[in-house]
Amino acid sequence: MAMNTETLSLIKQSIKTIPNYPKEGILFRDVTSLLENAAAYKATIDLLVEQYRNKGFTKIVGTEARGFLFGAPLALELGIGFVPVRKPGKLPRATISQSYELEYGHDSLEIHTDAITANDKVLVVDDLLATGGTIEATVKLIRQLGGEVQDAAFVISLPDLGGEARLTALGLELVKLCEFEGE
């Protein structure tokens, strides 16, 4: 489905670039500036609704924390459940965990064991795709619980960091509203 170029431009222009944050040489893409712009935020959710309406999804999974900001409103608009994937120790019921590699070490994510069933067709939503490590871990959690996941949506993609290739290798179809070069 072709997306409106004018709307995509509004979204991309609302994302501020912060040089040398969090460290020297990084161009940080600040999605919080998009959230501050009601028209751009609404346009983002509306585009995702248009993209995924009537596709048969039963759940949206969002990864902590900014995935919640786009996944939850999308789930409401689609009339389906939202499932948060969180850092360890943040979910109150029984969970499963998946580790993933960071630049310097590793971390892990958790999901409630009863949040996804074998009947669920799941869309993963996050704000930014960089290396793909957190989304790969999220997909593994969903699949471990028996959910079907073949789609992931992102507001921002940084294709130079390899995440797109990593996730397509997992069999995911990706929707990215904005792409930025560099790190």
Swiss-Prot record:
Keywords: Cytoplasm, Glycosyltransferase, Purine salvage, Transferase. Pathway: Purine metabolism; AMP biosynthesis via salvage pathway; AMP from adenine: step 1/1. Belongs to the purine/pyrimidine phosphoribosyltransferase family. Gene3D superfamilies: 3.40.50.2020. One of its GO terms (biological process) is purine ribonucleoside salvage. CDD domains: PRTases_typeI (cd06223). Its EC number is 2.4.2.7. Homodimer. GO terms for cellular component: cytoplasm. It is found in: Cytoplasm. Coiled coil: none annotated. Catalyzes a salvage reaction resulting in the formation of AMP, that is energically less costly than de novo synthesis. It comes from Shewanella sp. (strain ANA-3). This is Adenine phosphoribosyltransferase. It comes from the Bacteria. It is an enzyme of class 2 (transferase). InterPro entries: Ade_phspho_trans, PRibTrfase_dom, PRTase-like, UPRTase/APRTase. Its main location: cytoplasm. It catalyses: AMP + diphosphate = 5-phospho-alpha-D-ribose 1-diphosphate + adenine. One of its GO terms (molecular function) is adenine phosphoribosyltransferase activity.
